[in-house]
């Protein structure tokens, strides 16, 4: 999901 990608962008 996109949420996982956002977490990685932190």
Curated annotation (Swiss-Prot):
It comes from the Eukaryota. Disulfide bonds: none annotated. Keywords: Antimicrobial, Fungicide. The keyword Chaperone does not apply. GO terms for biological process: defense response to fungus; killing of cells of another organism. The synthetic peptide has antifungal activity against B.cinerea (MIC=20 uM), F.oxysporum (MIC=20 uM), A.niger (MIC=41 uM), C.albicans strain 01U (MIC=13 uM), C.albicans strain 38U (MIC=7 uM), C.parapsilosis (MIC=105 uM), C.neoformans strain L26 (MIC=209 uM), C.neoformans strain L30 (MIC=209 uM) and T.rubrum (MIC=3 uM). Has no antibacterial or cytotoxic activity. This is Antifungal peptide. It comes from Cenchritis muricatus.
């Amino acid at each position: 999901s996109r949420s996982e990608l956002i977490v990685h962008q932190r």
